[in-house]
């Protein structure tokens, strides 16, 4: 952000001795940090600033986009990853679950040209209506709520729920074969769709 540029954010996290990371599933992205309770207010402040005021240059975005493509290429060197990608593409014909968390290769390759889209994605999805804030450990709950109101309170609402295509009922078996150029024993994967989880 303008207040906490990437180098400053990284330095602060390191100086706190905090452990920060993130992961993405088909349904959400989670950002997590472990730190001492003495740093609780600073963490609440810098994280609220990051999620409300993220700012990054196009060159940095393009570098990161290249790293994402490298990760994708590494992942598909695994027959299991290729199998999972094909499984999702076969099981779903309309719903966004059709692609893996990383997405389709053509989209990932084009990512360096999607700087403006990345900013609109952030503006659209990173809204207070979409946030779940969890804090666990030794802290004063009343003091924490005061901090949350102070740092997250001004965040402007404005999320517009996207239209997610409804997956039509599957009428029969679907099958697919994955071509894999590396060496592996044969792998068979069988999946069933379950009920929607709300």
What are these regions (language model features)?
Residues 1, 13, 31, 47, ...:
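Buried hydrophobic packing residues in well-ordered domains
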Residues 1-33, 99-103:
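M16/MPP (pitrilysin/insulinase) zinc-metallopeptidase core fold and M16-derived inactive scaffolds
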Residues 3, 34-65:
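M16/insulysin-pitrilysin zinc metalloprotease superfamily fold
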Residues 14, 55-73, 140, 159-172:
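Acidic/histidine-enriched alpha-helical segments
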Residues 53, 57, 141-142, 154-157, ...:
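Short beta-strands and strand-coil junctions in structured, solvent-facing domains, enriched
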Residues 65, 80, 115-151:
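Non-catalytic, conformational "gating/processing" segments within enzyme and secreted inhibitor domains
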Residues 73, 160-198:
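His/Glu-based metal-binding/catalytic segments typifying zinc-dependent metallopeptidases
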Residues 90-131, 163-167, 196-198:
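Histidine-acidic residue clusters that define the catalytic metal-binding segment
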């Amino acid at each position: 952000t303008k207040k906490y540029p990437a180098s400053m954010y990284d330095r602060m996290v390191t100086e706190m001795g905090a452990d920060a990371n993130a992961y993405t599933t088909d349904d959400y992205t989670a950002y997590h940090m472990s730190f001492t309770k003495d740093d609780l207010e600073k963490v609440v402040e810098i994280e609220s600033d990051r999620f409300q005021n993220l700012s990054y240059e196009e060159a940095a975005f393009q570098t990161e986009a290249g790293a994402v493509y490298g990760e994708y290429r590494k992942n598909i060197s695994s027959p299991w990853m290729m199998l999972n990608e094909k499984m999702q593409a076969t099981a779903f014909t309309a719903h966004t679950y059709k692609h893996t968390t990383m997405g389709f290769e053509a989209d990932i390759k084009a990512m360096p040209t999607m700087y403006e889209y990345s900013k609109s994605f952030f503006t659209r999805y990173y809204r207070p209506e979409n946030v779940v804030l969890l804090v666990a450990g030794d802290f004063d709950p009343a003091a924490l709520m005061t901090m949350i109101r102070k740092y997250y309170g001004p965040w402007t609402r404005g999320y517009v729920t996207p239209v997610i295509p409804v997956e039509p009922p599957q009428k029969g078996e679907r099958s697919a074969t994955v071509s894999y150029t590396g060496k592996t024993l044969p792998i068979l994967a069988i999946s069933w769709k379950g009920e929607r989880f709300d």
